[in-house]
Amino acid sequence: MKHPNTIDIKALQSSFQIIGLLGKPRHDVTLQMHKNLFQWLLEKGYQVLVERPIGEQLGLSENYLASVDEIGQQAQLAIVIGGDGNVLGRARTLAKYDIALIGINRGNLGFLTDIDPKNAYSQLQACLEDGDCFVEERFILEASVERNGKIIARGNAVNEAVVHPAKIAHMIDFHVYINDKFAFSQRSDGLIISTPTGSTAYSLSAGGPILTPQLNAIALVPMFPHTLSSRPLVIDGDSKISIRFAEYNTSQLEVGCDSQVALEFSPDDIVHIQKSPDKLRLLHLKNYNYYKVLSSKLGWLRNSV
């Protein structure tokens, strides 16, 4: 049975004419993979757009270079080479476009990168030419800062939005409202608001629950709360979360989106977090198994008896 969060790959596969190649290489060997994959895709007959900084390093001509937004506007598939951080950074931009995304893992855990670099070409060929893959839609979060009735800052998060003081080792006092109804007050180092995708990231480190990607749910996970009764809270994914702050808090507060974008605000402001209208579309290999990924990445594997 087809899951409602998946997309018909046959219809999408036929549209794969322009492919974007993205990712920030840490080492020369990764840059070599960009070069080899670029040539391989050209030989397969695809039109290829390369993220501008990478293309310039490779010495490609201008007609192959594009920004992340331009790739989102023109391409049907984005291939990101790197770790989850690379995928997160590109995904926040690409989510507003009608484009699928798949990652080649050059990082550590690689929860968002399906392709093994050792088998990259055979796996991509099976996906692009044989259709041995599927697209899964995942929701992302939108964080906004309200000041005097106006939104002054806005950002998207694939994994999580984190409310915290700008200085480390400082506690803050805040009140959380869900759908305009008071939920709880807390004194802690901050609050992690996580998507199912982000439940295996920062939220997991703070003792939050693992949410399977298909769940329409958001996890609220406290960071070092100053009470023994505080526990993570899982709420409906369509909820609107509003956070108000005590006036005596430090004047420098932030909402961090995927630990890559920071929205600064003051104690008089209100932070709103809710599901974004944009969606991330991840392209998975046909044999993708989320529970196998969990077991492998989190060390749950044991020898069978």
Swiss-Prot record:
Its cofactor is a divalent metal cation. Its EC number is 2.7.1.23. It is an enzyme of class 2 (transferase). It catalyses: NAD(+) + ATP = ADP + NADP(+) + H(+). InterPro entries: ATP-NAD_kinase_N, ATP-NAD_kinase_PpnK-typ_C, NAD/diacylglycerol_kinase_sf, NADK. The active site is at 84 (proton acceptor). Keywords: ATP-binding, Cytoplasm, Kinase, NAD, NADP, Nucleotide-binding, Transferase. GO terms for cellular component: cytoplasm. GO terms for molecular function: ATP binding; metal ion binding; NAD binding; NAD+ kinase activity. NAD(+) binds at residues 84-85, 159-160, 170, 187, 189, 200-205, 260. Involved in the regulation of the intracellular balance of NAD and NADP, and is a key enzyme in the biosynthesis of NADP. Catalyzes specifically the phosphorylation on 2'-hydroxyl of the adenosine moiety of NAD to yield NADP. PANTHER family: NAD KINASE. NCBIfam families: PRK01231.1, PRK02231.1, PRK03378.1. This is NAD kinase. It comes from Pasteurella multocida (strain Pm70).
